[in-house]
């Protein structure tokens, strides 16, 4: 379940910061060991981590908060939650973040942001359909197994009743035969 919009913006900003921080941390570890002098690899790597990871995480947080803000605003204005909102939010975010570079770069970034989020939404929709089909298949299998189990149970109960009836009739016959022998 998604959080309400104000909370969603904060959650997405924090999540984006964490993703950016970790990604840049991994990149800086690789770069630190590759570019550093052999006797100062660890110090150089940690210096890169302290310097660049928070900045990169902050950039991701800005992107995440802008994206969530636009997504929530579009949801409020359009009164719907569909795939158009995130795609438009991605385009708006890309355009706003590239606005300082001029119109040409802003339009290119907006197109890239919209296309990128559109690809993510298409993949998410495809995975959701696949999971839904698997869920329906599992439900159908469960219903078939349950039906088979119920049929087997009824069959066993029928067999038990027959055995009980046969056993009672044999006892009755034996009792009658025993009474006849006494006479």
Curated annotation (Swiss-Prot):
Domain of life of the source? Eukaryota
Recorded hits in Pfam families, A to Z, give: Tim17
Bias class Polar residues marks the residues at: 131-141
The record's principal subcellular location, in a coarse class, is: mitochondrion
GO BP field: protein import into mitochondrial matrix
Compartments where located: Mitochondrion inner membrane
Q: Where are the transmembrane segments?
A: 13-33, 57-77, 107-127
Mode of membrane association: Multi-pass membrane protein
Q: List the GO cellular component terms.
A: TIM23 mitochondrial import inner membrane translocase complex
Write out the biased-composition intervals (Basic and acidic residues).
142-168
**Residue segments, region Disordered:** 131-183
Q: Which UniProt keywords apply?
A: Membrane, Mitochondrion, Mitochondrion inner membrane, Protein transport, Translocation, Transmembrane, Transmembrane helix, Transport
Q: Where is the composition biased (Low complexity)?
A: 174-183
Is Secreted among this UniProt entry's keywords? no
Query: Which family is this protein grouped under?
Result: Belongs to the Tim17/Tim22/Tim23 family.
Entry function = May be involved in the translocation of transit peptide-containing proteins across the mitochondrial inner membrane.
* Name this protein carries in UniProt: Mitochondrial import inner membrane translocase subunit tim17
Gene symbol here is timm17
């Amino acid at each position: 379940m998604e959080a309400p919009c104000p909370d969603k913006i904060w959650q997405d900003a924090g999540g984006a910061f964490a993703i950016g921080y970790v990604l840049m941390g991994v990149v800086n570890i690789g770069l630190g060991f590759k570019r550093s002098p052999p006797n100062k690899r660890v110090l150089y790597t940690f210096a890169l981590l302290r310097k660049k990871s928070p900045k990169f995480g902050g950039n991701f947080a800005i992107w995440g908060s802008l994206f969530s803000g636009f997504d929530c605003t579009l949801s409020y204005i359009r009164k719907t939650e569909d795939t158009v909102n995130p795609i438009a939010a991605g385009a708006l975010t890309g355009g706003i973040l590239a606005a300082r570079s001029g119109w040409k770069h802003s339009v290119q970034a907006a197109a890239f942001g919209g296309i990128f989020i559109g690809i993510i939404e298409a993949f998410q929709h495809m995975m959701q359909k696949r999971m839904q089909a698997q869920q329906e298949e599992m439900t159908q299998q469960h219903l078939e197994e349950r039906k088979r189990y119920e049929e087997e149970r009824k069959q066993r109960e029928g067999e038990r009743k027959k055995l009980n009836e046969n056993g009672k009739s044999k006892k009755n016959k034996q009792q009658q035969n025993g009474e006849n022998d006494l006479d």
